[in-house]
UniProtKB/Swiss-Prot annotation:
Protein known as: L-cysteine:1D-myo-inositol 2-amino-2-deoxy-alpha-D-glucopyranoside ligase
GO cellular component entries: cytosol
Organism annotation: Frankia alni (strain DSM 45986 / CECT 9034 / ACN14a)
Ranges spanned by the short sequence motif 'ERGGDP' region, renumbered to the chain: 155-160
Cystine connections: none
rRNA processing keyword on record: no
Role this protein plays: Catalyzes the ATP-dependent condensation of GlcN-Ins and L-cysteine to form L-Cys-GlcN-Ins.
Length: 413
């Protein structure tokens, strides 16, 4: 985050979902990280331009649609709508642009053509591949050995064993039309794009030259981000594609990373249907560093429900301790590589002091919460102490952490 301090506008690009199933907590944790990044940047005075793609044509989507007897476009539309509902429910700040691969086909074709013109692409049968030899910096993002790259490439959608390639690591740029698959016309023949070139083209078209922050899960570091950067840099004849990368750690359930293939998933939509306090769910996710893998359990949500209850009780008090200290502490922790658990601990300290001063019991009433995702600059002075302190802390929690401290009203009330 500190690398962006001098830029008036921060350009964020985050790799989005492949919409063939509902949003699980691993997805939610990933997008929460970049929601938090947006909030910190806006609070520090930056404008933010945020683009997120949607991989709305890809093998897993086509396979699921075929399995379920659905048109792949209908399946994608349904799951995209559910994903956006889940993100809104979790109070994620929406990207300025959601861009589907299907709508981006013309710009993707243009970038593939540029790579062909630069001699960085070649045919294997009717498919078109990118030559990693054209990208001298290939490998600098993931810092993996060649042996590691080959193993991971095979696990994550690559085809290192395909004959005819110049290098086993060369990624697919354009897949020639296959029977029963969607395809689009291009100068290289009808087909559809490879995975990595999609993000290269979308990011360039919507964000211009260099992306300030490129995001996604740790499983996207290689091959996806490595290859996307290589495509963009060779096409532009300049580097870097992105000034910084933030890769979000994996969330596990039952001892394994949450994954659609394994089926060990906790869905946001299921928790919503069960009437889960979504402020508590957001707190449960925020209580983990984005840099370390962690395990989800129901007890985390139970603890978060109790925690948000204490926070709501504290901000409903008629007065409280000075809020300037907690405001400074939350900003300091978030500026340190988005240390959300540290920021929550700072709020806990203020809440404990407020409840102790009030005798430990909650007081009725509610606090008006400020507009989420803005800036707290200018808050302070006499307004940060006494009767104004609870409202300022509520606004802090809303604006910087995205947690709504309005009392939860029972269904049907």
């Amino acid at each position: 985050m500190r690398a962006l301090d001098s830029a008036p506008t921060a350009h964020l690009y985050v790799c989005g979902i492949t919409p063939y199933d509902a949003t699980h907590l691993g997805h939610a944790f990933t997008y929460l990280t970049y929601d938090l990044a947006q909030r910190v940047l806006r609070d520090s005075g930056h404008k933010v331009l945020y683009v997120q793609n949607v991989t709305d044509v890809d093998d897993p989507l086509l396979e699921r649609a075929d399995r379920d007897g659905l048109d792949w476009r209908d399946l994608a539309a349904r799951e995209i709508a559910l994903f956006r509902e889940d993100m809104t429910a979790l109070r994620m700040l929406a990207p300025d642009s959601y861009v589907g691969v299907v709508e981006a086909i013309p710009m993707i074709v243009d970038m593939v053509a540029e790579l062909v013109d630069r001699g960085a692409a070649y045919h294997v049968d009717d498919d078109l591949y990118f030559s990693v030899a054209a990208a001298p910096a290939f490998g600098e993002i993931s810092h993996l050995s060649r042996a590691e790259m080959l193993a991971i490439c095979a696990e994550r959608g690559g085809d290192p064993g395909r004959g005819g390639k110049k290098d086993p690591l060369d990624p697919l740029l354009w897949r020639a039309r296959r029977p029963g698959e969607p395809s689009w016309p291009s100068p290289f023949g009808p087909g559809r794009p490879g995975w990595h070139i999609e993000c290269s083209a979308i990011a360039r078209h919507h964000l211009g030259g260099v992306v300030d922050l490129q995001g996604g899960g740790t499983d996207l570091s290689f091959p996806h981000h490595e290859c996307s950067a290589a495509h963009a840099e060779v096409a532009a004849g300049a580097r870097p594609f992105a000034r910084s990368y933030v890769h979000t750690a994996m969330v596990s359930l039952d001892g394994h990373k949450m994954s659609k293939s394994r089926g060990n998933l906790e869905f946001v939509s299921r928790l919503r249907r069960a009437g889960t306090d979504l402020a508590a769910l957001r707190l449960a996710l925020l209580d983990h560093r984005h840099t370390a893998d962690w395990e989800w359990s129901a007890s985390l949500l139970t603890d978060a429900v109790a925690r948000v209850g204490r926070w709501r009780a504290a901000v409903a008090l008629p007065a409280g301790p000075d809020a300037q200290g907690v405001l400074a502490a939350v900003r300091e922790r978030l500026a340190d590589d988005l240390d959300a658990p540290g920021a929550l601990a700072a709020v806990d300290a203020w809440v404990d002091a407020a409840l102790a001063d009030a005798g430990g019991g909650p007081v009725g009433g509610s606090v008006g919460v400020g507009s989420s995702g803005g800036s707290l600059r200018g808050s302070g002075g006499a307004a940060s102490a006494g009767g104004e302190a609870p409202a300022l802390v509520a606004r802090l929690v809303d604006t910087l952490l995205g947690v709504d401290l309005e009392p939860v009203r029972p269904r049907g009330s």
